[in-house]
C-alpha cells in the first residue's frame, strides 16, 4: 500500500511540474507575441511620423514661397 501511495504522489508531482513548465512556456510565448505586436505598431508610428514631418516641411516651404510671391 505504501508503494502505491509513493507512486501516486510521484505521478502527481511530475504532473504538476510538467503543468508548471507548460504554463511558463505559454506565458513566454504570449509575451513574445505582444512584443512583436508592439514592435510592428512602433514601426507604423515611425513611418507615420516621417510622412507627417515631410508633409509639414513641404507645407512650410510652399507657404513661404507663396508669401514671397505676393
Swiss-Prot record:
Signal peptide from the UniProt entry: 1-22
Family: Belongs to the frog skin active peptide (FSAP) family. Frenatin subfamily.
The name this protein goes by in its record: Frenatin 4.1
Coiled-coil ranges from the UniProt annotation: none
GO terms classed as biological process: defense response to bacterium; innate immune response
Keywords: Amidation, Amphibian defense peptide, Antibiotic, Antimicrobial, Cleavage on pair of basic residues, Immunity, Innate immunity, Membrane, Secreted, Signal, Target cell membrane, Target membrane
Note from the entry: Frenatin 4.1a is a mutant of frenatin 4.1, it has the same peptide length and is non-amidated. Frenatin 4.2a is a mutant of frenatin 4.2, it has the same peptide length and is amidated.
CC terms in the record's Gene Ontology section: extracellular region; membrane; other organism cell membrane
Tissue: Expressed by the skin glands.
Effect seen on changing residue 50 to L: In frenatin 4.2a; important increase in activity against the Gram-positive bacterium S.aureus (gain of activity), the Gram-negative bacterium E.coli (4-fold) and the fungus C.albicans (16-fold), and gain of hemolytic activity
Keyword Aminoacyl-tRNA synthetase: no
Pfam families reported in the protein's UniProt record: FSAP_sig_propep (PF03032)
Residues where Lysine amide is found: 68
InterPro entries: Frog_antimicrobial_propeptide, FSAP
Propeptide: 23-46
Organism: Nyctimystes infrafrenatus
